[in-house]
């Protein structure tokens, strides 16, 4: 709905402003003064060219810094859906809003530069056609790749200029036929290269492994832990109905600190649904869930994660484009505080070192430290499940819920998992 609402809002503003007398209607505003920098008026194209590139590179650098940070990993987690991100304590609504505002700021700066460069401004460059063209640039270059935006914009404009010359000669008539060509190209790209053109560049020139600079990083804040034997979780007559189907039928059990408890049942018995009810992914039909003596039945996944409960999932949820180390560091989100502006200005490095030190420690704990620089999407299912456990441990939970953790693991990996669970106990 958001893309459609954004397009509709843009169309409404476009037509509204095009009918306002004081804005010049469709003719727009003429005689926009040049930008003045330190008393120097940028009247020529050369000065504006330098200024535009300065803004573009500064924006790219800020975006790269942001993506390589605590809030950046939270933003990248949105691509995999909200369930995993919320379970790590991330406010998905907040970061969607952050992305929207940052995109609006960049668009506003671009419009300001455009108006002063052209010395005139009218509604046509801000209409639906241009919006679709900008979207195509992002898709072609690679959504989520900062340099992909530059590549996509360059390719689209170069090809567009050539098509505007060649197509009228081939067809024998003039028109915006390049739109049809771009539509076909977009379908081909989405089918055969959904990650965009930059993904080919990234595969050919992979990034070097992250420099290990966190050996002397201070530890992250630790959560207060219950004493062995303390009552941690109480599930009391919990029931979940989907229409007329009863998925969980009045289940009750208690878990105490230091216990390893297994929830056993055949496929479709409601085990994962029970996990979802306990962790706030789904709401209860009736019953009560108490965590450390406090009712959590009506809380969100994020609030329950803040209370000290962490989990893995039946089907592995991760960010394939990030390294194993970065995926695990996502689990330390609630144990750090750096924000968007700090990340852009690179003022969060001390905290980042602490996050990566904790992530490496948890990977060593499960025997995956040697794979920490590999892309998570390149791992087999077994290591991906172990990585999920390391991510959950990185939250420093009081209660750890593992949904089918041994599924897909080989014998030696299962033995290693059993050792980790005994150590956590």
Listing of model-derived features with the role each one plays in the protein:
Residues 297-298, 356, 362-383:
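Conserved ABC nucleotide-binding domain
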Residues 1-218:
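Transmembrane alpha-helices and adjacent helix-loop boundaries
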Residues 279:
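Helix-to-loop junction immediately C-terminal to a conserved catalytic motif
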Residues 261-266:
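The feature captures the beta-strand-to-loop junction immediately N-terminal to the Walker
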Residues 287-294, 306-307:
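Conserved ABC transporter NBD signature motif
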């Amino acid at each position: 709905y958001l893309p459609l609402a954004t397009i509709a809002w843009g169309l409404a503003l476009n037509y509204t402003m095009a009918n306002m007398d004081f804005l010049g209607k469709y003719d727009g505003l003429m005689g926009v003064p040049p930008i003045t920098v330190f008393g120097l008026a940028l009247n020529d194209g050369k000065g504006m060219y330098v200024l535009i590139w300065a803004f573009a590179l500064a924006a790219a650098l800020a975006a790269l810094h942001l993506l390589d940070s605590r809030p950046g990993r939270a933003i990248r987690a949105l691509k995999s859906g909200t369930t995993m991100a919320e379970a790590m304590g991330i406010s998905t609504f907040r970061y969607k809003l952050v992305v929207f505002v940052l995109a609006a700021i960049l668009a506003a700066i671009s419009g300001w530069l455009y108006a002063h460069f052209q010395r005139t401004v009218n509604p046509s460059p801000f209409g639906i056609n241009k919006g679709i063209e900008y979207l195509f640039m992002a898709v072609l270059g690679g959504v989520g790749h900062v340099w992909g935006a530059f590549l996509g914009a360059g390719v689209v404009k170069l090809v567009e200029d050539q098509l505007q010359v060649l197509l009228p000669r081939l067809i024998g008539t003039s028109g915006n036929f390049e739109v049809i060509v771009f539509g076909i190209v977009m379908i081909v790209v989405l089918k055969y290269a959904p990650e965009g053109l930059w993904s080919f560049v990234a595969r050919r020139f992979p990034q070097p492994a992250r420099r290990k600079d966190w050996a002397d990083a201070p530890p992250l804040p630790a959560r207060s832990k219950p004493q062995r034997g303390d009552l941690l979780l109480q599930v009391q007559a919990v029931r979940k109905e989907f229409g007329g189907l009863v998925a969980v039928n009045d289940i009750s059990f208690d878990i105490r600190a230091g216990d390893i408890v297994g929830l056993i049942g055949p496929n479709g018995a409601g085990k994962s649904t029970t996990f979802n009810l306990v962790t706030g992914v789904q709401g209860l039909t009736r019953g009560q869930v108490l965590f450390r003596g406090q009712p959590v039945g009506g809380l969100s996944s994020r609030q329950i994660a803040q209370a000290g409960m962490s989990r893995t999932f039946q089907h592995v949820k991760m960010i394939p484009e990030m390294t194993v180390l970065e995926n695990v560091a996502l689990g330390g989100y609630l144990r750090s505080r750096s924000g968007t502006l700090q990340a852009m200005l690179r003022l969060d490095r001390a905290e980042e070192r602490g996050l990566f030190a904790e992530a490496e420690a948890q990977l060593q704990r499960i025997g995956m430290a040697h794979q920490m620089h590999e892309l998570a999407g390149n791992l087999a299912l077994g290591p991906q499940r172990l990585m999920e456990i390391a991510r959950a441990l990185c939250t420093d939970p009081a209660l750890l819920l593992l949904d089918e953790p041994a599924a897909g693991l080989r014998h030696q990996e299962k033995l290693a998992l059993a050792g980790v669970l005994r150590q956590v106990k």
